[in-house]
């Protein structure tokens, strides 16, 4: 009777002060209170036997009845727009304002289950500490789960388990830090959802996945804001199935046994925010998807010591249209079943495209790869900086033959197309390559800079070279800039197995690595450094080419060299046994300065364009100038290295029958300047070396 009196007192209190309150709170014995709008309530009555409390609604809208024994108390208070769950160790206090609108909340100790058939979006606010608790939500409509400084750990299950086909929003309440830890026998994730997840708010979430993933979702994951720290995870940090989208916020992932971000069979889209990822487990990835992977913005920092690891991995196409990416990799190649598996910055089974943004990576692992794609690689903008310094090695391939692996900055099984952007490559590993294409390479713009020091290595009695650009088919440049230095033994600048065509642009390559001999099945051979070389034709139609080799010929072809335009300065070694150019067929136009080497191979038959050969020593750094007989300037160039045998000069300003002068030293001003070559300027000073008349299209002085 005492309890009944308390209930009646509460009802009388309701009658007297209802005008000051908004909600009737019906507190049940399990610490769950249901809220009822006062304005919708006509009156509260007791059954005749006192066993039932009836809350009668206005306008005959119905009655909510409770067993008298189930009610702890009835209070009046303000309305609230959220279901609140406040954990307290193994207990929880719950206020449910939607208990009469399709939201049912039950609990067993600190394990809370929510079943919702509400048609409107419901908000759930979680706070307090649950020593061995969980939140399970079954909902048919979208909802928001607000973590307000909550700390939930569970020894055998997910901390948060969501069963819903609708969008579930997890809000990290501003200024708060929440912590979630699951057990080692739980579900797929410390947070697990069958439907899509969206993270909002500006709070912080620390999460540990002891069973499998830290966050697992069978649909999409979107990060709109907030900070998520994956403290550790047995498998992936964040695992989605249909898509992963990051628009803002920060995600930090470390100490994981799987991938940091795994989009599974879906897509990945990064528009903004910050990703700080560590890839420590072998053959795992920083950002992984089977479908398209796109970076439009944001800051991405990846540390990858894992052997066979991939910073970015997609079985489809990858695009970088913005953002800043920094990767530090040290993982090594691993040979499995006679096939090497590489540690790569980017690995795309499809194509790789970059239009903007920044990608900077340093890779010190053995045979480390920078950007690697099975399909075409297209770069039209942005800034790429890649450094590979890991060593090379050999293995037995699937056919039983000895094969090799080495580092590469950018490589593809198809074609490379560069039309813009800036690419800076530092290549230190032996056999390593800057750009490597199993197809063709097309340069129509952009800027490429390389610093190479890797040496050649002999594999199966054949040398494999450290090369700036290697094309297994054709190489064509029509615009853009390529500037490189190579100090490695047997180093190469640009090498094409097919036709090498220069239609424009600027090429400036210097090689200084020494030559070395090697023993093959057919005898002894020598690998030497070269600047520009091709197995097919080497065709120069336009542009500027400066090729300087301290130990070998500067430009060469195993088929033919055809020069019809542009400006070319080829300066090779002084050893008369080796030409500074190899395989020359014709010089029909343009400006061609052929310095040092076995120049007697250049004949009048080859030169239909007017050419003069000056066969006297020229010291390194000497300015060489040709003027007409009235000292009107035609061309000057500065010798990039010593020219003991002089040089030959082809220039459209030289005409058969004309009289000219050749000077060494002096100075030139004005005119058109490209690197160390000046045309149509003003010349003064210098020493007159020769006065001559061109009696034919080829004249030796």
Descriptions of predicted regions:
Residues 1-2:
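N-terminal secretory signal peptides that target proteins for export/translocation
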Residues 5-14:
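Sec-dependent N-terminal signal peptides
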Residues 21-24, 51, 81-83, 622:
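Short structural boundary motif marking the start of a folded domain
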Residues 37-46, 67-77:
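Structured surface patches comprising rigid loops and adjacent beta-strands/short helices at the edges
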């Amino acid at each position: 009777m005492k309890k009944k009196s308390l209930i009646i007192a509460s009802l009388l209190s309701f009658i007297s002060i209802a005008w000051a309150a908004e909600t009737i709170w019906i507190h049940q014995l399990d610490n769950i209170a249901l809220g009822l709008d006062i304005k919708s309530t006509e009156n509260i009555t007791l059954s005749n036997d006192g066993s039932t409390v009836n809350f009668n609604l206005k306008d005959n809208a119905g009655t909510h009845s409770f067993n008298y024994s189930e009610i702890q108390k009835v209070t009046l208070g303000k309305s609230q727009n959220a279901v609140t769950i406040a954990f307290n160790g193994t207990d929880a206090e719950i206020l449910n304002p939607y208990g009469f609108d399709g939201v049912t909340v039950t609990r067993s100790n600190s394990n809370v289950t929510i079943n919702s058939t509400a048609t409107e979006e419901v908000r759930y606010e979680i706070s307090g500490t649950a020593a061995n608790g969980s939140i399970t939500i079954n909902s048919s409509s979208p909802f928001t789960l607000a973590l307000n400084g909550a700390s939930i750990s569970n020894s055998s299950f997910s901390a948060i388990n969501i069963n819903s086909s609708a969008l579930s929003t997890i809000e990290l309440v501003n200024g708060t830090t929440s912590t979630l830890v699951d057990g080692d026998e739980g579900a797929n994730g410390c947070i697990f959802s069958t439907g899509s997840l969206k993270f909002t708010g500006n709070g912080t979430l620390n999460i540990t996945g002891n069973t499998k993933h830290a966050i697992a979702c069978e649909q999409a994951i979107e990060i709109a804001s907030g900070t998520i720290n994956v403290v550790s995870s047995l498998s992936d940090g964040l695992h989605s199935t249909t898509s992963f989208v990051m628009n803002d916020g920060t995600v930090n992932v470390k100490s994981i046994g799987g991938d940091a971000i795994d989009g599974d069979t879906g897509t990945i889209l990064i528009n903004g925010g910050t990703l700080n990822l560590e890839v420590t487990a072998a053959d795992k990835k920083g950002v992984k998807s089977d479908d398209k992977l796109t970076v439009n913005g944001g800051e991405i920092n990846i540390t990858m010591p894992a052997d066979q690891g991939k910073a970015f991995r997609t079985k489809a196409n990858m695009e970088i249209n913005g953002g800043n990416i920094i990767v530090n990799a040290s993982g090594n190649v691993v040979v499995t079943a006679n096939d090497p598996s590489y540690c790569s910055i980017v690995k795309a089974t499809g194509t790789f495209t970059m239009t903007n943004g920044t990608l900077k990576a340093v890779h010190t692992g053995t045979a480390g790869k920078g950007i690697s794609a099975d399909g075409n690689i297209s770069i039209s903008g942005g800034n790429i900086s890649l450094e590979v310094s890991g060593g090379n090695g050999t293995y037995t391939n699937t056919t039983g033959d000895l094969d090799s692996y080495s580092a590469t900055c950018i490589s593809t099984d198809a074609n490379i197309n560069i039309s813009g952007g800036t690419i800076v490559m530092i290549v230190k590993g032996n056999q390593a390559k800057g750009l490597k294409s199993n197809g063709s390479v097309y340069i129509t713009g952009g800027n490429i800079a390389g610093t190479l020091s890797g040496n050649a290595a002999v594999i199966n009695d054949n040398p494999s070279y450290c090369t700036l650009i290697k094309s297994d088919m054709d190489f064509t440049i029509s615009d853009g800039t390529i500037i490189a230095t190579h100090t490695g033994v047997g180093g190469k600048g640009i090498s094409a197995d097919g036709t090498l065509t220069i239609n424009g642009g600027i090429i400036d390559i210097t090689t200084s690595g020494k030559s070395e001999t090697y023993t093959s099945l057919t005898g002894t051979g020598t690998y030497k450094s070269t600047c520009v070389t091709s197995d097919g034709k080497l065709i120069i139609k336009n542009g500027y080419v400066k090729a300087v080799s301290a130990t070998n010929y500067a430009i060469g072809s195993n088929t033919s060299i055809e020069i019809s335009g542009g400006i070319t300065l080829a300066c090779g070694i002084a050893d008369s046994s080796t030409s500074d150019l190899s395989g020359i067929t014709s010089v029909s136009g343009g400006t061609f300065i052929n310095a040092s080497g076995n120049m007697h191979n250049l004949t009048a038959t080859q030169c239909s364009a007017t050419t003069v050969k000056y066969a006297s020593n020229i010291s390194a750094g000497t300015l060489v100038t040709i003027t007409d007989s009235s000292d009107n300037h035609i061309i000057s160039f500065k010798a990039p290295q010593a020219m003991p045998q002089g040089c030959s000069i082809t220039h459209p300003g030289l005409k058969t029958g004309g009289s000219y002068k050749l000077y060494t030293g002096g100075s030139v001003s004005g005119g058109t300047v490209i690197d160390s070559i000046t045309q149509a300027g003003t010349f003064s000073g210098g020493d007159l070396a020769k006065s001559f008349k061109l009696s034919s299209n080829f004249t030796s002085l």
